[in-house]
């Protein structure tokens, strides 16, 4: 006979961003708890609102499964003394298992007998295991936590109720001084405390108190309500997925409504209006059928439709205050002079150990000079790049960005266009922040891409130079994201810029404000981001490519893909093994690897030397790999007919030199001795 278990934790209002991850974590930890305790179940469903986390287990076994375990002990010769009595070693072993020597049996393993005991544990009734759910709740982890009253245990928010039901049976458990039972809380204003009748009646019992416990149902309610408003007014409403997820975690009983604002505010840049609505007020944006922004918004209240007109008026009033600010800053910022703002950046600290934002811009400008040539920018693009690099942070001192920091770069583009700068300069100022997340949008223009790389490289090198290097999960200056951005942009544009050579060039630059250091650490840091870009590529292939001598990001990613592509083919293993053997022996070469044909003693070493001399890796990675694999028969013939480590030192070094020259060329693709062929 199966049962159903419900566990609900009632809390103070949770931050919206915590709700969904905590709900998921609760479900995962409950499943692990049941598995650990040998309790089978049919399904686990989780619930969450801003004021509760809950999980329900259906089809739960009414008792633990019985457990039978075999334990191996000491060898028989150690377990028995010369008189055939059990030694202290054997007695201690069985005592540790809660058994006696009478439970011992001997089993033979590879010709030798060992002590074995079998321990049987009869499963307990589920009622005896349920109290352990308190430990599940205590094990939840959160990005922030607090303690309250006299309680030293830290948790995300103060706990108010604990509901634990096994079908209709309630459990009087204790969690942070809160007694468990069947009482739960309804909606803060529309509902009241209520008794949950059974584990299966949970949603309906709360629904009567204006709480929709299932987040999926709550989300669907919001979407359906928005769709009805769309149909009624003939408009298009942008249902942003992230905003929707945030809103559903702010309400327990959602009611969507449409408000409006004066059309005069539409003269302000759309980005300002959208930011005011989405980021600051959690409103959905409304457009006409052609995509034009309308003076309306959609909000979702935490409650029903009663007195909705008052709610709409209140939301409109709050939004207008935001829009007034935006309109004011838009008007006043146009009076500012870009060159004046750039000069004032001398007084804005980039970081106290590094210098000002203006100094950061100057260094970035120097880096763009190097990158422009390597990226093959035209004369016009180079001119636009130089201008963009000279002013690209100015908008940080505008009133608009001071109020709406999400608009940095975006407002820079707007203001530079108004000031008569070229569209390319304006676009680069917006694009230099890209990507803003791991999968974020990349710059579209070459000028913007180069400026983005230069800005990020100076940031990375500057922080490394003063010892502010990410460790573990700690990355307060988002250097991993910046590095990932550099790698992604280089790959997307296919620029053949060798990162090691570029970093060497940057270290050669001497600035009055900063001298770069920590080159090796920077290179390893960048390689780690390339590693991440390789995704699910097998670890050994990643290591082979990363250990190679070609540090062009696009080439490295292409090489890894090519190796994965051919790794299942018949000639992969023997070809890699041939190259790997060459790599291992080449490490023994001394000094400069020069080959003297006069020292050849057989045709096979001559053939390999000639093949290596004429080898020029070219074309796509798949073609280069074919070129290398085509050498496999020549390499094998060389090894079969040649004693590489000959007694004659000159002959030995000559043969090692052949292998050294081979591996030097092959290493531009990958270090093949890092690939596992077993």
Curated annotation (Swiss-Prot):
What molecular function terms (GO) are annotated for this protein? arginine-tRNA ligase activity; ATP binding; glycine-tRNA ligase activity
Ordered alphabetically, the record's keywords are: Aminoacyl-tRNA synthetase, ATP-binding, Cytoplasm, Ligase, Nucleotide-binding, Protein biosynthesis
Q: Which residues form the signal peptide?
A: none
Q: By its UniProt entry, which InterPro entries does this protein fall under?
A: DALR_anticod-bd, Gly-tRNA-synth_bsu, Gly-tRNA-synth_heterodimer
Please list the reactions this protein catalyses.
Answer: tRNA(Gly) + glycine + ATP = glycyl-tRNA(Gly) + AMP + diphosphate
Which Pfam family, any one of them, does this sequence belong to? Answer: tRNA_synt_2f
List the residue ranges forming a coiled coil, or say none.
Answer: none
Q: Which branch of life, at top level?
A: Bacteria
Primary enzyme class: ligase
Q: What is its main location?
A: cytoplasm
The record's Gene Ontology biological-process terms are: arginyl-tRNA aminoacylation; glycyl-tRNA aminoacylation
SUPFAM superfamilies reported for this sequence: HD-domain/PDEase-like
Where does the protein end up? Cytoplasm
> Which cellular components does GO assign to this protein?
cytosol
User: Which family would the database say this protein is a member of?
Assistant: Belongs to the class-II aminoacyl-tRNA synthetase family.
Subunit composition and interactions? Tetramer of two alpha and two beta subunits.
Annotated NCBIfam families: glyS
Q: What's the protein name?
A: Glycine--tRNA ligase beta subunit
Q: What species does this protein belong to?
A: Streptococcus pneumoniae serotype 2 (strain D39 / NCTC 7466)
What gene codes for this chain?
A: glyS
